[in-house]
C-alpha cells in the first residue's frame, strides 16, 4: 500500500538517454514500444545533446571527451530526475505491465 502512495507522488515522466548520433537500434526501439503500450499516460523525455548540451556541464564534457559515456549519462540521468522527477529507464528495459 505504501508503494502505491509513493508512486502516485512521482510525476508520470520516463527519462532515457541516447548520447549518440547513430540511429537507435531496432531492439531498443522494440523495448521502448512496450513503454508506450503499458504506460500510455506517461510523458517520455529523451535526453540527448540537444536537450542537454555537452557544454552545459564541464563534468559531462570531460567525461564524454574521455570516452566515459556511461559517466556522462549518469550525470544527465540524475540531473533529469532532480529537476523534473519521474522515472529513469535504460533503453533496453522492456515494460511488461503498468507501474500503477
List the model feature ranges, each with a label.
Residues 4-58:
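N-terminal anchoring/stem segment of glycosyltransferases
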Residues 13, 60, 93-96:
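Extended aliphatic helical segments
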Residues 21-28, 66-74:
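Aromatic-acidic/polar surface patches that form glycan- and anion
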Residues 48, 62, 98-100:
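Short, solvent-exposed coil/turn linker segments
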Residues 55-67:
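Charged, often glycine-rich, active-site loop that binds/positions anionic groups
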Residues 70-100:
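GT-A fold catalytic core of metal-dependent nucleotide-sugar glycosyltransferases
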Amino acid at each position: 500500500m505504501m508503494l502505491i502512495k509513493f508512486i502516485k507522488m512521482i510525476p508520470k515522466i520516463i527519462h532515457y538517454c541516447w548520447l549518440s548520433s547513430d540511429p537507435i537500434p531496432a531492439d531498443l526501439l522494440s523495448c521502448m514500444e512496450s513503454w508506450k503500450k503499458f504506460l500510455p499516460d506517461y510523458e517520455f523525455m529523451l535526453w540527448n545533446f540537444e536537450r542537454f548540451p555537452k557544454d552545459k556541464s564541464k563534468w559531462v564534457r570531460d567525461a564524454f571527451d574521455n570516452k566515459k559515456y556511461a559517466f556522462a549519462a549518469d550525470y544527465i540521468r540524475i540531473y533529469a530526475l532532480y529537476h523534473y522527477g519521474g522515472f529513469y529507464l535504460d533503453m533496453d528495459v522492456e515494460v511488461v505491465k503498468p507501474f500503477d
